[in-house]
Amino acid sequence: EKAIELDPNYADAHKNLGILLRQKRLLSKIEQAKKSEIKKSYKSNLRLTSNPFISNRKVEAELISQLYKINSKKLDDVDPGYLRYGNGKSSDYELFENNFSTIKTVEKDLINIMKKTVKSDIFIMESFFNIFQTGSGIISHNHIVNFDVTHGLLDQKFSLTYYLDIGDQSCDEPGVLKLQDPDREILPSEGMIVIFPASRNHSATYGGKKDRVMIGVNFYSLI
């Protein structure tokens, strides 16, 4: 908070404070859920009806155009030398804080899908979009952080990808979602939704000539 007082534009301070506040809200909601319902003993690979869980949602024509209007960074500037790379851009991790009507509709629909998939109320920690262009990608990674380990939340955290535009798949690197442990390759289709444990490593490489657009969400089940 001190850093923000000294420099209101200090982006990292804003970002870190936002993360801490969301983590605090998450723990509070989990505690409330424990009090209102006896916590069942699930394992993450049993909580999902399948791992990965695959569904579909029709993509609104105006959704993609709205994403292009939202502030974003070049992929090489988002995770310098670490995660995403190449041509393209990505939003911050608060996509669903935008008030575009279509984005709010998408948020509502995805929340319903997530709740049904993990059989629990959920809490969204991060929401974002990626626009991949020729020669872009994301290296193998997962979405587990120290906070999850410290608070025993590994089995309650999940990741979602929602493919809005699959781009150009007539190339050597069509943007296949590569999951590990166990290995599985998924060629996205328009409107495809994939949900899997956040601990599962995954990657993608894209070489098409047309933009490949997706929304990502990292979320927790409350029970």
Regions found by a protein language model. Name each.
Residues I30-S120, G137:
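Non-heme Fe(II)/2-oxoglutarate
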Residues K119-Y206, D211-M214, N218-L222:
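Catalytic core of non-heme Fe(II) oxygenases with the double-stranded beta-helix
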